């Protein structure tokens, strides 16, 4: 009991762990616009920033599309319309235009690369404006799923990252996992080859928190062995196991996939809590003894007084 009290006091009765977990797992944008290769300067975010000529162009294009679909609208017109989109109504219209383009075989022959260009631009605008539901409308289109199935372009990979990051940022985990399962069935190599996709999927699996989620997370982690030490990728399945009451497994995950380079307060804290919950109090204290000198050295290097 004395050991248990020591561990729990050092862990602040799990409050420290919970706070650290929220900082890593909470809904937020995982990758910056720069990291996602989104050039924000190419898009208009607010209605007030539009020039009267741009407003007139948008209105005219909407009228053309309403009356005759794409008969009087070029691919460049669609792309320009998206760059000037500032709200969900604009995005819904843009989505309908892209769907009409994807359904026109003649336009595919005339503009063979436009499908990915339009998909990428539309997803970028949705990300900038924070409109995941409008993005889902397009990505769920059968024609877009067909593009995903057939394309090997790097542009598809980038669009996927942007889309999944948008879903993660807005807490739409079911939709993210639906896309993951589609990719696992149709394009599994994209998941195997992309650490970014795997990370976003694993964060969503953590939120799902089922035994199947744990199995899927471990499968993904095993496919990305070369990325050992990535804190978020290691911590997600460990937390799933911990929350499911599989404390010994949680500790094993941290030991097997973690490295000394990735070992930090969050990982060390979870190791101690998992061992304590599993009744291995002596091992938990060993982890604590190893961690405290390391933490003191870090504080000294930063010019802070040693921890008491």
Language model features: what each stretch is:
Residues 1-308:
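A basic, Ser/Thr-enriched alpha-helical scaffold prevalent
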